Amino acid sequence: MKPKSKVAESTAASCFLVMSLLCSCIIGDQMETNNEGLSYSYYEKTCPKVEEIVRSSLSSMFILDPTSPAALLRLMFHDCQVQGCDASILLEPIRDQQFTELDSAKNFGIRKRDLVGSIKTSLELECPKQVSCSDVIILAARDAVALTGGPLISVPLGRKDSLSTPSKHVADSELPPSTADVDTTLSLFANKGMTIEESVAIMGAHTIGVTHCNNVLSRFDNANATSENMDPRFQTFLRVACPEFSPTSQAAEATFVPNDQTSVIFDTAYYDDAIAGRGNLRIDSEIGADPRTRPFVEAFAADQDRFFNAFSSAFVKLSSYKVLTGNEGVIRSVCDKVD
């Protein structure tokens, strides 16, 4: 595996996105759900074109910028993991608030907040004050998976937006570190109701996108690095791709390596790499060796349908975590400000 040029990524993505729209399958329960007050038909009467508007807004953007899907998926993960899926990650500091969740080093590289805001603007023209920013984040992440070749997941909607953004301290405590191991990861997702199989599946989100070198270099400073399932040749590759500068330097932050050999396609290559010890992060390597997770890694590598089904189930659980519904939250007119 080697770093991909933006031209190569763009060409691959442009061709693949058209095919993925034809091949994606809808996975998920289509019936009404009372899970956290969400519903699969929430906007049926108030904004029936919501999913169409979100998808059409994203399709052209993904062709122009093939890194967008991974950015939107990460945006959703980081929003949901800090006090639930409430679009707080989109808010600018409120009044005298100095350090918000976006100031956390763990949120380094968060992008495409503006794209969510642009989609929200389009929705306001179609159906004012009906669709929450938190639902837009979930739908955008869902479509990011589908438009790169993954399953088109049916997600319940009806989330409301928060009135404030958590502090940097809260984000620091709730987002996992780049050095997270299997124990930390399984505990994190178990708290969101996921089985081990679903936890391994949701890690498959790493099949698209890149890893910044500041997170890769932290592995080499880890005293337990020698116990990781890491191919020595791949370690050499990482050291060449991410030279020995400080993990906190600007050079480390600006340099990155692809997550797997098909980093613009949502497929099972991540699991092939995990088995072979070719993971950028510690968890990416250890997940293929730990006896609790390896059977599922092997199963997903061999059976894409099983991976897609487990990922879809995990995605719905994560996107339904600690949501605000009814009068618990609001619907912002503009995503980065409270009305």
Swiss-Prot record:
One of its GO terms (biological process) is hydrogen peroxide catabolic process. Heme b binds at residue 206. SUPFAM superfamilies: Heme-dependent peroxidases. One of its GO terms (cellular component) is extracellular region. It catalyses: 2 a phenolic donor + H2O2 = 2 a phenolic radical donor + 2 H2O. Transmembrane segments: none annotated. It holds the Pfam family peroxidase. Its cofactor is heme b; Ca(2+). The keyword Cytoplasm does not apply. Its main location: secreted. The record marks 74 as: Transition state stabilizer. Binds 1 heme b (iron(II)-protoporphyrin IX) group per subunit. Binds 2 calcium ions per subunit. Disulfide bonds join 47-127, 80-85, 133-335, 213-242. Keywords: Calcium, Disulfide bond, Glycoprotein, Heme, Hydrogen peroxide, Iron, Metal-binding, Oxidoreductase, Peroxidase, Secreted, Signal. Removal of H(2)O(2), oxidation of toxic reductants, biosynthesis and degradation of lignin, suberization, auxin catabolism, response to environmental stresses such as wounding, pathogen attack and oxidative stress. These functions might be dependent on each isozyme/isoform in each plant tissue. Belongs to the peroxidase family. Classical plant (class III) peroxidase subfamily. There are 73 peroxidase genes in A.thaliana. This is Peroxidase 29. It comes from Arabidopsis thaliana (Mouse-ear cress). The lineage of its organism: Eukaryota, Viridiplantae, Streptophyta, Embryophyta, Tracheophyta.
